Design a protein with these regions (language model features):
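N-terminal acidic leader/helix
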Residues: 6-44
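Short intrinsically disordered terminal tails
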Residues: 1-9, 86-93
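Short, compact, well-ordered microdomains
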Residues: 59-85
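Generic hydrophobic secondary-structure signal
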Residues: 1, 27, 32-34, 57, ...
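Short acidic alpha-helix initiation/capping motifs at coil-to-helix transition points
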Residues: 44-56
Length: 93
């Protein structure tokens, strides 16, 4: 898996998020997370994106619980893609 494939896989089902934050913004942040080789730093970046995602979804009219659930699923896809991308790097997961 390469970075472009990882970003595509993560953002494929993120229409609600890309509509309120914008596809380029979401793709940029996911790309930066995928480029980060350090697990801890990647996770911090992921958590920041998750918080921002929840805020944007709520601002866009989604209920808090629904926004948190969507962001949690999105966060899971980001984490899974990061692990697949970096599996061959010998990075401790």
């Amino acid at each position: 898996m390469n970075i472009e494939d990882a970003v595509t896989a993560v953002t494929a089902d993120a229409n609600a998020l890309t509509s309120c934050l914008g596809q380029p913004v979401v793709a940029y942040h996911v790309t930066e997370i995928m480029r980060e080789a350090d697990l801890e730093h990647a996770r911090q970046m992921q958590l920041a994106l998750m918080r921002r995602s929840i805020e944007a979804l709520v601002d866009d009219g989604l209920e808090d619980a629904a926004a948190e659930q969507f962001a949690s699923q999105f966060d899971g896809r980001v984490g899974s893609a990061w692990k697949l991308l970096h599996a061959a790097d010998g990075v401790a997961h």
